[in-house]
Design a protein with these regions (language model features):
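Noncatalytic scaffold domains of N-terminal-nucleophile
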Residues: 25-49, 53, 57-242, 247-299
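Bacterial N-terminal signal peptides
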Residues: 9-22
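A short acidic/small-residue loop/turn micro-motif
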Residues: 105, 464-466, 526-527
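M16/insulysin-pitrilysin zinc metalloprotease superfamily fold
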Residues: 301-317, 512-520, 527-552
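Extended C-terminal subregions enriched in glycine
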Residues: 338, 453, 500-503, 534-535, ...
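Internal maturation/activation junctions in enzymes
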Residues: 253, 257, 316-462, 473, ...
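Active-site rim segments in enzyme catalytic domains, especially the processed small/beta chain
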Residues: 74-99, 116, 258, 263-268, ...
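Short Gly/Pro-enriched turn/cap motifs at secondary-structure boundaries
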Residues: 78, 129-130, 207, 282, ...
Length: 634
């Protein structure tokens, strides 16, 4: 074990990669974070500082998580206030895990027919027609009202200071410049982001003070609503909910809808007024003495639980970390779990029958049946969804669709022959060690917070990232999450677009408990790779004995065989990302097994996590060793 630190520790971002040899005992590129009293970790240094400031004010982990959420939504390259927030909260008073569903819904008029009439196969990736109703403001306000201690005024103070002006990071400033063609399509976005119109570089310079007066005015309205309610004798909770009402039913809603519709959006005042945050029961499974909690099937989170159920009977330690057999086992169970995700997951609201078969999907017997079909000699490029209904005593209402389900979407085109293909040992044609997709870093962040009272919060907020379409004079970037719907039942019967429905999303915070007490809190960005990376992080800790920082930095694999949740929803059977330092013999063996290999310098996903050291009564923090992920502990 590493020595405990008695002074506050800070995790600093750096760009480095780790080899695959001897990782269980490897030195890390960043030190582990240690704390006795509290911990705040997220994807941005300024946002982590906002969490630390909130703890110093006397806030609990929920207050700190909300402050970090407000700060990250003010920084735009990961998300905006118009996006969506998903959270798991451990309440030490009840010893229960709580799920927060603050995902927006498709607005009135958003139907398959609407998009087909515009020659679209899916809702668009960007712009006002990509937007569901804003969820993050409601999620933050409900979490704070129900489980926090501080006022909204205190919690929003760091974000409001940032909206007044903060030195913009190079990552966002350069992303604005790259995306300025899109940004110029929307007048409010153009006015906000392109601070040097007509210049060779129209985006802000790195380090330039970036000001958001419209957003500051919106946040001020929320605080004013709270303070007026308090002055009128309302309770703390009711005063915060007065701010909620002002956002979703008051003048903020009016300007949001006006700005959306002016630019071609579909939102109505009724859409915002009817939308509500849901406080839900999470789903869970057990894995060798650990209880692992995820959000319900409106996220992809249960796919990680299905994978754990399939892996539990296997001797992963004997296979060896990132051995050929271990990689193959991971890839195959992920094939199966994500095939089920693509077919069976969707909004479980009673208004959208039939109900998703979550009981069968999470059945251990179903997992054993699925794993029994794994071919240990080759990748199964035709892995399809199973039928979980018999494992919950039911009949599959979509049996006919299941029988016709294609293995890949869209059906793959024959690859052109290449004289070099034999020499590449299964490498994806044209792929190189620096071929990292920009989308890997595009949107979403993760937030982890914990305190000495026992509150633990894990959040995966997203939506409204750059290039964001700003809704009028609110300063709020609208979500892009509607693209995760499909328009036809043949592509996913539970996730077909309907007004008022939530899309099935990739966002997936995670809590693991041991003996009823928090053991790990973890989350990551990365779209369809999120649960792949969290699965491997969890196994790194519980199977291979890595510390939380070692597990965060350790190279993972990523599969692209599942259907993408974005854009054209493409799947690439057999495509696997391996770390560039994966041994040549492992690459050769995997190539012979039918894998299409792409080498990458970064494969672990920017994971942030907290480990609870019960032996010493302390917390260990782990934070990604590339990007801007950052933490503070005390």
């Amino acid at each position: 074990m590493q020595d405990r630190l008695t002074l506050p520790s800070v995790i600093l971002g750096c760009a480095a990669v780790l080899g695959v040899a001897s990782l269980a005992a490897a030195a890390t590129n960043k030190p582990a974070l240690h704390g006795r009293h509290w911990m705040a970790i997220t994807g941005k240094p300024l946002a982590a500082t906002a969490g630390a400031m909130t703890f110093q004010r006397g806030g609990n982990a929920v207050d700190a998580a909300c402050a970090m959420l407000a700060a990250t939504t003010t920084m735009f390259d990961t998300l905006s206030w118009g996006g969506e927030t998903q959270a798991l909260i451990y309440n030490p008073k009840t010893r229960k895990v709580i799920a927060i569903n603050a995902l927006g819904v498709a607005p009135t008029g958003a139907t398959p027919e609407f998009f087909r009439s515009r020659k679209m196969s899916y809702p668009p990736e960007y712009g006002p027609l990509a937007a569901v109703t804003p969820g993050t403001p409601g999620g933050l306000l409900v979490m704070l009202a129900e489980y926090g201690k501080l006022s909204l005024k205190d919690v929003l103070a760091p974000a409001m200071q940032m909206a007044e002006g903060y030195p913009i990071e190079a990552e966002l400033a350069d992303a604005i410049e790259r995306q300025k063609k899109h940004i110029k399509e929307w007048p409010y976005s153009k006015a906000l982001f392109l601070t040097h119109p007509g210049a060779a570089r129209e985006a802000p310079q790195p380090g330039e003070v970036f000001r958001q007066p419209d957003l500051l005015a919106t946040l001020t309205k929320l605080v004013d609503a709270e303070q007026k309610a308090l002055a009128a004798g309302k309770s703390r909770k009711d005063a915060i909910l007065a701010a909620y009402d002002r956002f979703y039913r008051g003048d903020i809603a009016q300007e949001f809808v006006r700005g959306s519709r002016e630019q071609g959006g579909l939102h109505t005042l009724e859409d915002l007024a009817k939308w509500k945050v849901k406080i839900e029961e999470p789903v869970k499974t057990s894995y060798r003495g650990f209880d692992v909690y995820k959000l319900d099937v409106w996220t992809q989170g249960p796919a990680m639980l299905q994978a754990l159920n399939m892996l539990e009977p296997m001797d992963l330690k004997a296979m060896g970390y990132n051995s050929t057999r271990y990689i193959h086992a991971l890839y195959q169970v992920m094939n199966l779990a994500f095939a089920d995700r693509d077919f069976y997951y969707g909004d479980p609201d009673d208004r959208f029958p039939p109900a998703e078969p979550r009981q069968g999907l999470l059945s251990k017997d179903y997992a054993h049946q699925r794993a029994a079909g794994i071919d240990w000699s080759r990748n199964d490029a035709n892995a399809k969804p199973g039928d979980p209904y018999p494992f919950q005593g039911g009949t599959n209402p979509y049996a006919e669709l299941l029988g016709k389900w294609p293995a890949a979407w869209p059906p793959p085109k024959p690859a052109a022959a290449s004289a070099e293909s034999g020499a590449l040992n299964g490498l994806e044609p044209g792929a190189g060690p620096h071929d990292v997709p920009e989308g890997f870093f595009a949107g979403t962040t993760s937030i982890e917070a914990a305190d000495e009272e026992g509150w633990v919060v894990s959040v995966t907020p997203s939506g409204g990232w750059n290039p964001a379409c700003i809704a009028g004079r609110t300063g709020i970037g609208m979500s892009q999450r509607m693209q995760s719907f499909v328009l036809d039942a043949s592509e996913g019967p539970f996730n077909v677009l309907e007004p008022g429905k939530r899309p099935r999303v990739t966002l997936t915070p995670t809590l693991a408990l041991k003996d009823g007490k928090p053991y790990l809190a973890m989350a990551v960005q990365g779209g369809d790779t999120q649960d792949q990376n969290l699965l491997q992080f969890f196994l790194n800790v519980v199977e291979f004995g890595m510390t939380v920082q070692e597990a965060v930095e350790a190279p993972n694999i990523n599969s692209y065989q599942m259907r993408s949740s974005f854009g054209d929803h493409q799947s690439i059977p057999g495509r696997i990302d391996l770390h560039e330092k994966t041994p040549e013999w492992t690459r050769e063996e995997l190539g012979k097994m039918g894998y299409r290999i792409r080498l990458e310098p970064k494969t672990s996903g920017p994971i942030n996590a907290i480990y609870f050291d019960r032996e010493h009564g302390t917390m260990w923090g782990g934070s990604s060793d590339y990007g801007e992920d950052y933490g503070v502990g005390w």
